[in-house]
């Protein structure tokens, strides 16, 4: 057994999972958690893995990517998924938990492991030696300053401003056209043209749609030069037509005329299966958001794989900074995990902690860190956050659009998703003993 100790900073979902995975591999862990010595604006207890928003870990079925990632984690002995299964409450096809029982169970499993030493103190600098940083979206100001210093100001962010992303297969290609503004460069955008009547209908729905209430500590984010589309719209109809929906230079090749307004979609992944809606960062609730977006010509039946969000979220530019092992490129023994890496969601955060923990343990034991292939859900997330376009990087949930394409094209969505799941689980079984 190695005498080296791994520092894990943060006992949220990712940090708790990472600590457990390291400890069960015979490596000593120092798990640092500043609560209750210093609380965050969102937490209320001193328990590990406290769920601060919903009590749902989302879909549990294998026809959904987050269901697949859960099953992969079960096979890899995830402490988070084990605790969730033990504390589950009725939720249809989803996995929801009694949040207090869940946090208590995770705390018990991790804290009581003989290889884990818990340190209730705030870390304000990045430690020497093997370390996993899993401090989450509300990282303390002092540590944030050190991380900003480490990564560089251009690669460290304090809030999400993510536009919605849709599956290409769900776009009505008969209503859109491929073109770049003024035909500059290659035709890179799918354009959804609107008549004045269609724009008016869209505009009225947008300004009437219900938004997510801002938390006190989020109120400054809209003044950082990234305005929600509904806030722009509230300043008058023409704000959008002269802003993100401006039609100039985007003549419709079918009519030869310039539409009244245009919504542009930009390819979001290397495989070309996902498109984001340019300039549509939003604070709308998800139900109204879907209704508004489906008023856009060509998106009437759009499958939204990530909804637009704007909220406080400390994260790094992982494509520039991390390897798919969750290692920092400039320092082999420094790992990042959780929402800080750009994975979005409870389960995805825990999954990143699982892989970072395994790799930290392997590193101190003299073994090569593992890269999970992108045919798996966990591997596809690691691949996305480290290989996607760094310039437009924003956090992402697990979805089948991130998986490596199937060898054989399957038209029916349910059958296609089943094939993704079967391939992922067959592959992950080769890694259960790492």
From Swiss-Prot:
SUPFAM superfamilies: FAD/NAD(P)-binding domain
GO (cellular component) term, any one: cytosol
PROSITE patterns: GIDA_2
Keyword tags: Cytoplasm, FAD, Flavoprotein, Methyltransferase, NAD, NADP, Transferase, tRNA processing
Gene Ontology annotations of biological process type: tRNA methylation; tRNA wobble uridine modification
GO molecular function terms listed in the Swiss-Prot or TrEMBL record: flavin adenine dinucleotide binding; tRNA (uracil(54)-C5)-methyltransferase activity, 5,10-methylenetetrahydrofolate-dependent
Binding site for FAD: 10-15
A Pfam family annotated for this UniProt entry: GIDA
Cofactor(s) in the UniProt record: FAD
Cellular localisation: Cytoplasm
UniProt EC number: 2.1.1.74
Main location: cytoplasm
Uppermost EC category: transferase
Catalytic activity, reaction form: uridine(54) in tRNA + (6R)-5,10-methylene-5,6,7,8-tetrahydrofolate + NADH + H(+) = 5-methyluridine(54) in tRNA + (6S)-5,6,7,8-tetrahydrofolate + NAD(+); uridine(54) in tRNA + (6R)-5,10-methylene-5,6,7,8-tetrahydrofolate + NADPH + H(+) = 5-methyluridine(54) in tRNA + (6S)-5,6,7,8-tetrahydrofolate + NADP(+)
Function in brief: Catalyzes the folate-dependent formation of 5-methyl-uridine at position 54 (M-5-U54) in all tRNAs.
Family under the similarity heading: Belongs to the MnmG family. TrmFO subfamily.
Stated name of the protein: Methylenetetrahydrofolate--tRNA-(uracil-5-)-methyltransferase TrmFO
């Amino acid at each position: 057994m190695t005498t080296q100790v791994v520092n894990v900073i943060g006992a949220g979902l990712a940090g708790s999972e990472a600590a457990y995975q390291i400890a069960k591999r015979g490596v000593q862990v120092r798990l640092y958690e500043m609560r209750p010595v210093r609380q965050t604006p969102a937490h209320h207890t001193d328990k590990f893995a406290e769920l601060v928003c919903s009590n749902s870990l989302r879909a549990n079925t294998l026809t959904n990517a987050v269901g697949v990632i859960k099953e992969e984690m079960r096979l890899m002995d995830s402490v988070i998924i084990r605790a969730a299964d033990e504390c589950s409450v009725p939720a249809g096809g989803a996995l929801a938990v009694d949040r207090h029982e869940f946090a208590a169970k995770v705390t018990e499993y991790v804290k009581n492991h003989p290889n884990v030493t818990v340190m209730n103190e705030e870390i304000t600098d990045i430690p020497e030696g093997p370390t996993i940083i899993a401090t989450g979206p509300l990282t303390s100001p002092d540590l944030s300053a050190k991380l900003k210093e480490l990564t560089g100001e251009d690669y460290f962010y304090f809030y999400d401003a993510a536009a919605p992303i849709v599956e290409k297969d769900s776009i009505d290609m008969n209503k859109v056209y491929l073109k770049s503004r003024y035909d500059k460069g290659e035709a890179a955008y799918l354009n959804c043209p609107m008549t004045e009547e269609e724009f008016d209908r869209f505009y009225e729905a947008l300004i009437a749609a219900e938004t997510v209430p801002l938390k006190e500590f989020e109120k400054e984010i809209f003044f950082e030069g990234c305005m929600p589309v509904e806030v722009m719209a509230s300043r008058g109809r023409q704000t959008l037509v002269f802003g993100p929906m401006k039609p100039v230079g985007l003549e419709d090749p079918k009519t030869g005329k310039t539409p009244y307004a245009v919504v542009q979609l930009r390819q979001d992944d290397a495989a070309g299966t996902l498109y984001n809606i340019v300039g549509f960062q939003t604070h709308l609730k998800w139900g109204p958001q879907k209704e508004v977006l489906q008023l856009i010509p060509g998106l009437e039946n759009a499958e939204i794989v990530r909804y637009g969000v704007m909220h406080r979220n400390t994260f790094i530019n992982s494509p520039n900074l991390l390897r798919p092992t969750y290692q920092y490129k400039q320092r082999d023994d420094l790992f990042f995990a959780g929402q800080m890496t750009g994975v979005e969601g409870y389960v995805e955060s825990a999954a990143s902690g699982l892989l970072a923990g395994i790799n930290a343990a392997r590193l101190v034991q003299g073994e090569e860190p593992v890269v999970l292939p992108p045919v798996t859900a966990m591997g596809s997330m690691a691949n996305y956050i480290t290989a996607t376009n760094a310039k437009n990087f924003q956090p992402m949930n697990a979805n089948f659009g991130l998986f490596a394409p199937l060898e054989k094209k399957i038209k029916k969505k349910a059958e296609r998703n089943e094939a993704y799941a079967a391939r992922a689980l067959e592959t992950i079984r080769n890694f259960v003993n790492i």
